[in-house]
């Protein structure tokens, strides 16, 4: 079948018209790309040339979707920190600028998830559902945007809530030698936030995989994982991931804080973070200082911990409470990193190996521990019993040391030592068993009223459990007043102590004072 000349002409004209229209409307989306080249690779870092426009801490893309951070920016060469498995990279590979800083996904979808510092899921539950992405490096709130620490954060640990109180927005350092229970205190605090409208972020920095797995299993078994985000870097991860981990975790926590929520973040631990930064700095040939740490080691921790605060009401009133953990060596709390963190934070909880060896858990040395701002947030009921308790415990520790030399002691001193031993026994607490506020106050009030003094030491644990069980008989109106800011009245004391006396009656005995030799 042959087409008529007129029809063929019309078809050509229509086709040419469409092509001309498409040509006029076409606007090529040209995107300039700046490509550099790897010149050398070392453990966790790479030297890159050919990227004259790169900025400090800008993300660089390496082959196989490996990312790095521009850490040293020189005129001719870039020192990049690698954030993934870099063993397949080699000199001569291409490197591309990404044009933005490191960011991390944030949002409600991260609750209950386990991720690494660049937002990749590690729990096998599929991709993350994020509300937004925030840079990991963010400025801390201005002074005028901060509110004083005025609301308590219950840890569920008797000795902390009574003698070393922590408030919302506070930064309380936990430090001690290896295997003294530092992580256990932080995890118990997370467990105690259940049904208290406090979200949690647990950041494991360069930890053993078995240790992190144990923490995650505890959170899961106790139902705490549902309100917790876990950010993990293991000991075999590149040092770059360990370096950015606490900053990424803080951005995740800040998202909730800016929505008016209360958030608790645990850094476990900043000793590994400091060592990772030292390793990167030495590999990048930055000048070393004390203990081979770079000169800005104080600044990297201060800018991190200054992001923890209590926002003013006009910004939503949210809070970010930080519990950084530091590992000491041979009980030396005057070392470089511990003293840096002590000066940055609002107090410290020191765990003593000596107490740990005696079976006093948590092994908190009350004399070396302090909370500089938490006392202002402590409930009045705690303040009514804490001051006398701390003084009595301090006297006991001093006299116990004196008695160890074999001196003959009078009856008054023996009584003080006996009372102190019962204070120590009552302050013991098993791991993963946070105690409610009313139960804590009942036990502490019984201590200050000397009700435990006639209870044998070998049944102190059973007697304490009986006191805690007896709190169910305390009138509801007294319990409500204890939870508020009202002071503890004499009527309230009597209402609490009456069921406590009844609970302790089966354990009472007339104990004969023994001479301590």
Curated annotation (Swiss-Prot):
Q: What is its EC number?
A: 7.1.2.2
Residues reported to bind ATP: 176-183
Q: Does the keyword Translocase apply?
A: yes
Which Gene Ontology cellular-component terms appear in the entry?
A: plasma membrane; proton-transporting ATP synthase complex
One Gene Ontology MF term = ADP binding
Q: Which Gene3D superfamilies match?
A: 2.40.30.20, ATP synthase alpha/beta chain, C-terminal domain, P-loop containing nucleotide triphosphate hydrolases
Its recorded reaction(s) are: ATP + H2O + 4 H(+)(in) = ADP + phosphate + 5 H(+)(out)
Instruction: Give the record's keywords alphabetically.
Output: ATP synthesis, ATP-binding, Cell inner membrane, Cell membrane, CF(1), Hydrogen ion transport, Ion transport, Membrane, Nucleotide-binding, Translocase, Transport
What the protein does comes down to:
Produces ATP from ADP in the presence of a proton gradient across the membrane. The alpha chain is a regulatory subunit.
Protein name, UniProt field: ATP synthase subunit alpha 1
Write down the species: Shewanella frigidimarina (strain NCIMB 400)
């Amino acid at each position: 079948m042959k087409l008529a000349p007129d029809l063929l002409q019309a078809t050509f004209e229509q086709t040419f018209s469409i092509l001309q229209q498409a040509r006029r409307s076409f606007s090529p989306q040209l995107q300039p790309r700046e490509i550099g080249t790897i010149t050398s690779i070392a453990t966790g870092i790479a030297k890159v040339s050919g990227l004259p426009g790169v900025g400090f801490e800008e993300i660089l893309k390496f082959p196989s979707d490996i990312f790095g951070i521009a850490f040293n920016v020189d005129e001719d060469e870039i020192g990049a920190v690698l954030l993934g498995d870099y063993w397949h990279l080699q000199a001569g590979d291409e490197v591309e600028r990404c044009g933005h800083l490191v960011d991390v996904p944030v949002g409600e979808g991260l609750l209950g998830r386990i991720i690494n510092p660049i937002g990749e899921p590690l729990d096998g539950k599929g991709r993350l559902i994020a509300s937004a992405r925030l840079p990991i490096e963010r400025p801390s709130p201005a002074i005028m945007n901060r509110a004083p620490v005025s609301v308590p954060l219950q840890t569920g640990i008797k000795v902390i809530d009574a003698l070393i109180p922590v408030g919302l927005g506070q930064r309380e350092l936990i430090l001690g030698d290896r295997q003294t229970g530092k992580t256990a205190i932080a995890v118990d605090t997370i467990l105690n936030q259940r049904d208290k409208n406090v979200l949690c972020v647990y950041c494991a920095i360069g930890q053993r995989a078995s240790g992190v797995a144990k923490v995650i299993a505890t959170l899961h078994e106790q139902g705490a994982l549902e309100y917790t985000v876990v950010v993990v870097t293991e000991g075999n991860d590149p040092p770059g991931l360990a370096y950015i981990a606490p900053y990424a975790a803080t951005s995740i926590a800040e998202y909730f804080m800016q929505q008016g929520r209360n958030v608790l973040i645990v850094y476990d631990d900043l000793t590994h973070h400091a060592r990772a930064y030292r390793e990167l700095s030495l590999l990048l040939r930055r000048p070393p200082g004390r203990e081979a740490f770079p000169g800005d080691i104080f600044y990297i921790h201060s800018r991190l911990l200054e992001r923890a605060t209590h926002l003013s009401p006009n910004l939503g009133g949210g809070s970010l409470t930080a519990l950084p953990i530091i590992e000491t060596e041979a009980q030396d709390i005057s070392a470089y990193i511990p003293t840096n963190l002590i000066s940055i934070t609002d107090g410290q909880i020191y765990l003593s190996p000596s107490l740990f060896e005696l079976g006093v858990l948590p092994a908190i040395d009350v004399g070396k521990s302090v909370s500089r701002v938490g006392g202002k947030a402590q409930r009045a009921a705690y303040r009514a019993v804490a001051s006398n308790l701390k003084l009595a415990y301090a006297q006991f520790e001093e006299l116990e040391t004196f008695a160890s030399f074999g001196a003959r002691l009078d009856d008054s001193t023996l009584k003080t030592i006996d009372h102190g031993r019962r204070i120590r026994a009552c302050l013991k607490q098993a791991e993963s068993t946070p105690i409610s506020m009313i139960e804590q106050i009942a036990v502490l009030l019984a201590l200050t009223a000397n009700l435990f003094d006639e209870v044998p030491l070998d049944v102190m644990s059973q007697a304490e459990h009986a006191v805690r069980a007896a709190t169910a008989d305390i009138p509801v109106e007294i319990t409500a007043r204890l939870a508020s800011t009202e002071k503890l009245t004499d009527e309230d004391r009597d209402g609490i102590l009456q069921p406590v006396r009844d609970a302790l009656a089966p354990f009472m005995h007339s104990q004969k004072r023994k001479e301590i030799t």
